[in-house]
Amino acid sequence: MANFDLTRINCQYLDRHLTFPLLEFLCGKEIYNQQELLEYILETVNKTNMIDYTMDTRKRLNLSQEMPDELVQRKAEVLATLKQLQNEVAPIMKATDILKNGESMKDSKTFVNALQKDYNFKVEHLESAYKLAKYLYECGNYQESTSYLYFCLIVMSPNDKNYLNVLWGKLAAEILTLNWNTALEDLTRLRDYIDSANFSTIQALQQRTWLIHWSVLVFFNHPKGRDLIIEMFLYKPLYLNAIQTMCPHIMRYLATAVVINRTRRNALKDLIKVIQQESYTYRDPITEFLECLYVNFDFEGARLKLHECQTVILNDFFIVACLNEFVEDARLMIFETFCRIHQCITISMLADKLNMKPNEAECWIVNLIRNARLNAKIDSKLGHVVMGTQPLSPYQQLVEKIDSLSMRSEHLAGLIERKSKQNNKESIDSWKYY
């Protein structure tokens, strides 16, 4: 299934350190040649300051067990540079108690005043803290790096030349330390900055494309991520436009989120429209499964695609944890769609559509009825399932209306903002003639 693997293209939009978990994940699969994959990891890790990881990769490639002279020298240089940077920030390193106390850092002005008064803080110390945070990150010491990056965010002005780099670095470090709550906060902060910054159209598109890829890592690991990925990718026009323009392969992750999110079935209609629009640029078993089911009503095709979906998800680092949930919810979607067409269904027919044995299918339906997720009755003698009516709840109708209005409002706001910028530009240009 290498033809459906997105690792290569996803890594193009990720920081070098964020690619390592994806590459290590692939090492446990049989998609690519193991030797070539390890050689690529070694080539990539050589561009960082993670000497121990470099040596470990060399051992896995059956290279020399002893550290080469070049690496010995590099390790000494890394340690020397690290010590020098730590000496430069020594005046604020004494403030580690404040760094650990989040409450005292919420008010930026108060915090800076305290640093200046108690620790003789100067502006040049901020540049040193930034350099140390970046160097610690390059060494793979992500946890310690986050402390200094947080310090920089509190003290720095948003107009500082390094502010955007700090936002990206903080998000990457929190992802790599699996701090998903903080990572989500950093993701939101970075998105707000990108959306409000005075970037050119191309720069904004590039920034959003990178953010989209990084956010997938957060959304599929945070409890609220399944709702947030739908809101951001499907109902924020600027990000939907970035996906359609730069990275239509992200449709895989949006589609997966909708399938496994039973409370957002109202998003299916909008998702299907986008999938159809982008079908000429990107297709995979997950998007094709939804097309088979909701566009063509091809249940046999959906059944076959669901089987392919399992292989795709099993080999995708971003969504592998969703495999069982995806299969369960996809079967439910097949069942619900089939039931809208046929009010009375034989269990054997249903089992065939769901890739299940008849007794497994019957137990599965019984559990659905028992858990109040299905209005139906089973006639065991005839082997039939008789469906009842399933009206859309007022809550679902309200959510659908709100999503629709939200998307339209954001689209109109974007049009007004672009028109305003154009008028301002024309006004400024007119002064050139006087």
From Swiss-Prot:
One of its GO terms (biological process) is formation of cytoplasmic translation initiation complex. The keyword ATP-binding does not apply. SMART domains: eIF3_N, PINT. One of its GO terms (molecular function) is translation initiation factor activity. InterPro entries: eIF3e (IPR016650), eIF3e_N (IPR019010), PCI_dom (IPR000717), WH_DNA-bd_sf (IPR036390). It comes from the Eukaryota. Belongs to the eIF-3 subunit E family. Component of the eukaryotic translation initiation factor 3 (eIF-3) complex, which is involved in protein synthesis of a specialized repertoire of mRNAs and, together with other initiation factors, stimulates binding of mRNA and methionyl-tRNAi to the 40S ribosome. The eIF-3 complex specifically targets and initiates translation of a subset of mRNAs involved in cell proliferation. PANTHER family: EUKARYOTIC TRANSLATION INITIATION FACTOR 3 SUBUNIT E. This is Eukaryotic translation initiation factor 3 subunit E. The gene is eIF3-S6.
